[in-house]
UniProtKB/Swiss-Prot annotation:
It comes from Laccaria bicolor (strain S238N-H82 / ATCC MYA-4686). Residues 1-3, 129-151 are lumenal. This is Protein GET1. Required for the post-translational delivery of tail-anchored (TA) proteins to the endoplasmic reticulum. Acts as a membrane receptor for soluble GET3, which recognizes and selectively binds the transmembrane domain of TA proteins in the cytosol. Interacts with GET3. Keywords: Coiled coil, Endoplasmic reticulum, Membrane, Transmembrane, Transmembrane helix, Transport. One of its GO terms (molecular function) is protein-membrane adaptor activity. It is found in: Endoplasmic reticulum membrane. The chain crosses the membrane at residues 4-23, 108-128, 152-168. The keyword Transmembrane applies. InterPro entries: Get1, Get1_fungi, Helix_hairpin_bin_sf.
Length: 187
């Protein structure tokens, strides 16, 4: 794959992650992780929740005055279940925090980190050459910092790609926003 397309795809993927949102991707990835690993803690949490709800439902049906012993036993059971659920929730939150750190690191490496590496690795290689005389004395800026004169450097190409992708996003948002406004006005 050519350097030109590789850089464009890297910039596009980075912007796509930005558009979707890292937290949305984190939640999707964590849900998938829980399904694939079949986490025992998550299964226990679900079972404990349903057990607490069933016990609480029975507790609400029991009269505290007429059947005090049964009511007290159910109340202790609900309280114990809630305490166990709190402990389990803190364990799951700790696990999710660890997963979040790893996931965010992976996203950064796969988007921004790869762009830095590609920019550094190909810093002296031109992405493409410009026809002579098109930009006159400003052609050196397009080759900045290390590409040969008369060419476009990786850094400049990354900036141009990002600008085009962000502009494309704005155009799509404006077009969909106007069409949605039209639907709301006409109905």
């Amino acid at each position: 794959m050519s350097l030109l397309i590789t850089i464009f795809l890297l910039v596009f993927i980075t912007q796509l992650v930005s558009w979707i949102g890292q937290t949305v991707l984190l939640e999707l990835a964590y849900a998938l992780y829980l399904r694939l690993t079949r986490s025992a803690a998550f299964a226990r949490q679900q079972a404990l929740k349903s057990e607490i709800l069933a016990t609480k439902s029975e507790l609400l049906k029991t009269s505290a005055q007429d059947q005090f012993a049964k009511w007290a036993k159910l109340r202790r059971s609900v309280d114990k279940g809630l305490a166990d659920l709190e402990k389990l929730n803190s364990q799951i939150a700790s696990s999710k925090s660890s997963f979040s750190l790893k996931f965010n690191s992976a996203i950064w490496i796969l988007t921004t980190g790869v762009q830095f590496v590609v920019g550094w690795w190909y810093r002296r290689q031109p992405v493409f050459y410009l026809p002579e005389g098109w930009f006159g004395p400003l052609a050196w800026w397009l080759a900045f910092p290390f590409a040969p004169a008369g060419s476009v450097s990786v850094g400049v190409w990354q900036m141009a790609c990002k600008r085009v992708v962000v502009l494309g996003e704005r155009v799509v948002k404006d077009l969909t926003g106007e069409s949605l406004d039209y639907v709301h006005v006409s109905s």
